[in-house]
């Protein structure tokens, strides 16, 4: 492994609380997935990070975990799978909802299916009978437990290099003064004030604009998203 990258990894491990997340992500992105030595060093770093005292998962660890789990080195894949069989985000639910399937889709970067599954889970959490209605009313949102919204958000945020998730969308919405037109443009759901067509005009990868995913149907109005963004889940989050 080049000494420069090794030194960067060591520095990364020292600065786990650094605010320079972008630089940390770039270091990880530059690691050669076909180089077993580099992957082994990355695996060692991952072990040190997640077994440390007071560990809390973040998007840096999310990218490391994805890099290890999606490598072609079966020894590395087995190591990551055994170390974190349920992923690195605690899958907490007030309704005993199973989030392992969503975690796996996001880890393997199948964002279209992850988005569809997210909508299904929100409908289930709200107690809606999916056989009679497969969308949410704004009155359904308050029925969704805060803990579950936080888990869904953390999964999206952790496995998107910090770009996606409900809380990121909420931050953007607040930053544009709750102006929905500006919000749609900012997150790439509209282009030149024309709503994007589903699914072909949305970006199902990490190259989409910040806040691009998960999707909600803005053609049904803004009340559902407004209810989500003002949910008690984000108080002291």
From Swiss-Prot:
One of its GO terms (molecular function) is tetrapyrrole binding. Keywords: Chloroplast, Plastid. It comes from the Eukaryota. GO terms for cellular component: chloroplast. It is found in: Plastid, Chloroplast. The lineage of its organism: Eukaryota, Rhodophyta, Bangiophyceae, Bangiales, Bangiaceae. It comes from Pyropia yezoensis. PANTHER family: TETRAPYRROLE-BINDING PROTEIN, CHLOROPLASTIC (PTHR34800:SF1). Disulfide bonds: none annotated. InterPro entries: GUN4-like, GUN4-like_sf. Belongs to the ycf53 family. This is Uncharacterized protein ycf53. It holds the Pfam family GUN4.
């Amino acid at each position: 492994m080049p000494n420069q990258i090794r030194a960067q990894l060591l520095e990364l491990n020292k600065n786990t609380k650094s605010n320079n997340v972008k630089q940390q992500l770039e270091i990880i992105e530059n690691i050669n997935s076909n180089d077993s030595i580099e992957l082994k060093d990355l695996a060692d770093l991952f072990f040190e990070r997640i077994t440390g005292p007071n560990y809390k998962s973040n998007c840096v660890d999310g990218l490391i975990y994805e890099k290890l789990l999606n490598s072609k080195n079966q020894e590395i894949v087995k190591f990551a799978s055994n170390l974190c069989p349920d992923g690195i985000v605690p899958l907490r639910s007030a309704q005993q909802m199973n989030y392992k399937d969503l975690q796996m889709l996001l880890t393997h970067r199948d964002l279209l299916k992850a988005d569809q599954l997210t909508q299904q889970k929100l409908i289930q959490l709200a107690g809606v009978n999916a056989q009679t209605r497969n969308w949410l009313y704004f009155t359904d949102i308050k029925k969704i437990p805060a803990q579950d919204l936080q888990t869904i958000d953390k999964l999206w945020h952790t496995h998107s290099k910090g770009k996606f998730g409900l809380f990121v969308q909420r931050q953007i919405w607040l930053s544009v003064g709750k102006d929905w037109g500006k919000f749609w443009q900012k997150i790439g759901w509209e282009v030149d004030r024309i709503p994007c067509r589903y699914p072909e005009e949305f970006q199902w990868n990490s190259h989409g604009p910040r806040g691009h995913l998960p999707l909600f149907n803005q053609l049904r109005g803004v009340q559902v998203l407004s209810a989500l963004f003002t949910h008690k889940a984000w108080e002291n989050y």
